[in-house]
Amino acid sequence: IEVNARLSRSSALASKATGYPLAFVAAKLGMGYGLFELKNSVTKTTSAFFEPALDYVVCKIPRWDLSKFHGVDRELGSSMKSVGEVMAIGRNFEEAIQKGLRMIGQGMHGYVENKELNIENIDESLQEPTDKRIFVISKAMHKGYTIDQIHDLTKIDKWFLQKLKHIIDIDEKLRKCTSVNVLDKYLLREAKVYGFTDFQIARAVGLEEEIHNMYKAGLVIRNLRKNYGI
């Protein structure tokens, strides 16, 4: 990340994400020890002279509590307005971002299948960086906005937009299932691999409207997964 004599928030995140004890190792190095002399805190036998190898993706998302303060400007800029952050881990970016969005305390179920946002002008909402903009992007993609259009309005890198569009594509395939009975195991497995919860799947196939109970709807999908061995 960078070379300095202190432990920053970024290096603390890197330590949590990799499982490598940066603070402990940095303190020992400052005392004159070499990396080859320090023991790996996990194995207790090998040295700390190794590079962590990750087979997962870590996503850090700031948490804002702007709704608690009346009249506050929701636009985000260079001044820090976040009151904390969440760290989500997944085998792919789609899974990690959906997990993170569920944890930021805005009452969302992930990137898709959330409560409907009342947006008067999608273009303006995409241009203004706010704590809700990622959900505006989700709505825009459902409305048919292309990756290039959203990139021009938000200036967000297309790699991230392509990953978010992948979640939308899976959601659209789920919505084409008229009932849970036509939901095949391959689509169900794909949805679970990319971070969809049982409730998100249930809402996408219209099961929540049929049962009128979100918890029971999620349990139906859970039992279906068990039958499929997923």
Question: Which role fits each region the language model picked out?
Answer:
Residues I1-G195, L219:
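ATP-dependent carboxylate activation and anion-phosphoryl transfer catalytic cores
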Residues E190, F199-I230:
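C-terminal amphipathic alpha-helical interaction region
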